Amino acid sequence: MPVRRGHVAPQNTYLDTIIRKFEGQSRKFLIANAQMENCAIIYCNDGFCELFGYSRVEVMQQPCTCDFLTGPNTPSSAVSRLAQALLGAEECKVDILYYRKDASSFRCLVDVVPVKNEDGAVIMFILNFEDLAQLLAKCSSRSLSQRLLSQSFLGSEGSHGRPGGPGPGTGRGKYRTISQIPQFTLNFVEFNLEKHRSSSTTEIEIIAPHKVVERTQNVTEKVTQVLSLGADVLPEYKLQAPRIHRWTILHYSPFKAVWDWLILLLVIYTAVFTPYSAAFLLSDQDESRRGACSYTCSPLTVVDLIVDIMFVVDIVINFRTTYVNTNDEVVSHPRRIAVHYFKGWFLIDMVAAIPFDLLIFRTGSDETTTLIGLLKTARLLRLVRVARKLDRYSEYGAAVLFLLMCTFALIAHWLACIWYAIGNVERPYLEHKIGWLDSLGVQLGKRYNGSDPASGPSVQDKYVTALYFTFSSLTSVGFGNVSPNTNSEKVFSICVMLIGSLMYASIFGNVSAIIQRLYSGTARYHTQMLRVKEFIRFHQIPNPLRQRLEEYFQHAWSYTNGIDMNAVLKGFPECLQADICLHLHRALLQHCPAFSGAGKGCLRALAVKFKTTHAPPGDTLVHLGDVLSTLYFISRGSIEILRDDVVVAILGKNDIFGEPVSLHAQPGKSSADVRALTYCDLHKIQRADLLEVLDMYPAFAESFWSKLEVTFNLRDAAGGLHSSPRQAPGSQDHQGFFLSDNQSDAAPPLSISDASGLWPELLQEMPPRHSPQSPQEDPDCWPLKLGSRLEQLQAQMNRLESRVSSDLSRILQLLQKPMPQGHASYILEAPASNDLALVPIASETTSPGPRLPQGFLPPAQTPSYGDLDDCSPKHRNSSPRMPHLAVATDKTLAPSSEQEQPEGLWPPLASPLHPLEVQGLICGPCFSSLPEHLGSVPKQLDFQRHGSDPGFAGSWGH
């Protein structure tokens, strides 16, 4: 797998940088978009919300002139200066009287700072707010010694000046007076009021408020002076690569890769030559020879010294090499890198880099040879580097086999050195020359001579023979030509056989299992990567987009390690799944105010429905026109919301975007694009899943709806999938029958198409209706046209009532038994001609009754859903004159009574103003957790077709 590079894609870290610089300074600021018509507020921090008492939802999209903060005592001149500064895109300090949400007022010092993009155009404004009373209180609370010290400096300047110099009219006097005012600049560094010069509390109180206004309105500092910092203080609003410290080396840079390979070769050299040098090359004659010359006589010693220097340099480089923390962030700060290295591999690297043979050179001790040999083995600690460097290749089968073979050979080399050391140390003390070195000398004809230290086999003969013995013992071959004779040699041989059996069984016996295990993750990675590359090649994706795809895939793989969370969770029981999901989403469920007060069972049910998504910079989460079926919660990173490529809002951690589910019964469409500025982690939940859980916990639903604050509502107010049940008259979703304010709460209106399906005569006399989006109509004329249409509909209703009266005789012929007095019912008759007719059903002594005013029923007289389901016309709150609609055919016509329904009749239909809960007429979910007026939203009734249509008659049983 590739090197873990961390978050290296270009990111727009504008908001993150601002918040990070403001941390710990108690700033209250907001950000406004200068490219919008009213400079709308696109972000405000928590300090601003706490200062004024408004929530972020209430502040977003407000004009940055902050008219909602003004009151009756707010001076218009200050408001004008603020507006003029925003209009002219210039820096300004304004002292203004603002009001909090609780109607309390206070004097506020506002700093206006324009933000320019890379082209030099002002695109945003940062407005910082400070309570002037708090600033004065901070200055007055300084210690007496500090105030005396500041007064001594100011007093010496004023008392020892020339006569008339410090007068109030001179420039020096003005400067001194202004210096006594607590100066405020929008600093991103540590802000310390103790550093500002001022006089005593009494001198501060002498300055009149209008004088402060006069001096603060003429501030003309540049942005760099206002911010009092360098270039990295206020970043440009654009995609920026992660900033790296000047003298820091990236851990994935080409230089670091070459250096790592060089260090790897040096480690291998150390692992091979250190045991060989300690066992074979250090002897008494070698030590005496070294004592006669300098340290650089032996070439191998010089090479060891160079290797030690290289490892010391590597330690220094490690102190300046970036690393990736647990949040996948590239850390380049030198202090954090040093702390991380100290806690990690520093101790091992430091011990392995000590040149012990150089430190004890020419000590003159007899134990020098043994001590040097033992201390040289400390360099083997550098093998830990091999594990670190070669870990990335552990998933490749060929590399694993090669590493295993190298490990086997290295262990055999070490054992050979130990085998020779045992024979060499034991040989002088043996009475009978039976050691393996003496046997080797006899076989080679190079016997040892006690008087000649240089006698015996050569170093090469001894090393090759020892290596041959260890390899034959490890592989359990053992030809016997080199055999252990002494007890020490036999004990060592037993240990070698045990090690060999374990290595042989674990490595060579399980090669196929090792390859299969190591290939499992790599095979999945390369399979997915191959699909991505084939997709890029087939569709000819351009290089910039191709790089984004590959980087996102690699980052997503390192983020999830190729684990499919859904597949993993399916293998566990539901109770354990809920616990796992509750742990994964614990930060959101614990800190979001909307979920406070929820029981453990409710939180578990919500956690199962939540999904986690990760977005790289530049990724579009929601497009314009997308159906808003998901609610998003930001847990890390920042996003921007754009309309026509203009930023209308910037959201960060703990913000929520989508649509307020409680205000709309059906999902709407997005009115903007949502794009990630940085690497973002988001929690999302489907609308239907949220409502399903809240239906199961109705007690928590009310608390949730009241506490849920959607930071930015993406719903397009001009349209949606279905018309909202509580849309105001004049909306484009329905233009037929409109209800009054109190009637709109009771039932949704019936559209003109519904009425024309029942009575086709209406359609002939109605004027042609144009789409509200047609350019022929002016939106200002809609109320007049709607009023005229209502009058026409009223006239049509009057004519329909007269027709009902004329058809009374026909209804009387169909009655088989008398009806109770005081009630009149209406049925829809479908005779053989398949023509629908609205006719009343009444007894012979019952008059049709007075017509309904305006053709509508008051809400209290409208039948409820439960009454309709029970098919019972008994309504205590219903008027005696309220009609009950029923559908009848030639075969099922029967008298309709208020006390019973004859068999064969359809259940009584509701008022035309009510949704019908008849199977086949209504489609759509009903969520009891929604507010009462959004509980059930029917689709349009299937009454548009005329009764003569055969399909219509078939639907009623013909």
UniProtKB/Swiss-Prot annotation:
Residue ranges occupied by any PAS domain in the UniProt entry: 41-70
Sugar-bearing residue positions: 449
Extracellular side: 283-298, 362-370, 420-463, 485-490
Location of the motif Selectivity filter: 476-481
Ranges for region Disordered: 720-751, 845-910
Annotated region described as cNMP-binding domain, given as residue ranges: 594-694
Pfam family, one: PAS_9
Topological region Cytoplasmic: 1-261, 320-340, 392-398, 512-958
GO cellular component: monoatomic ion channel complex; plasma membrane
Entries under SUPFAM superfamilies matching the protein: cAMP-binding domain-like, PYP-like sensor domain (PAS domain), Voltage-gated potassium channels
Tissue note: Expressed in prolactin-secreting adenomas.
Alphabetical list of CDD domains matching this protein: CAP_ED, PAS
Intramembrane segment spans (from-to): 464-484
The keyword Transferase is assigned to this record: no
Gene3D superfamilies to which the protein is assigned, alphabetical: 1.10.1200.260, 1.10.287.70, Jelly Rolls, PAS domain
Domain PAC: 92-144
Subunit relationships: The potassium channel is probably composed of a homo- or heterotetrameric complex of pore-forming alpha subunits that can associate only within their subfamily.
PANTHER family, A to Z: POTASSIUM VOLTAGE-GATED CHANNEL SUBFAMILY H MEMBER 6, VOLTAGE AND LIGAND GATED POTASSIUM CHANNEL
Protein name: Voltage-gated inwardly rectifying potassium channel KCNH6
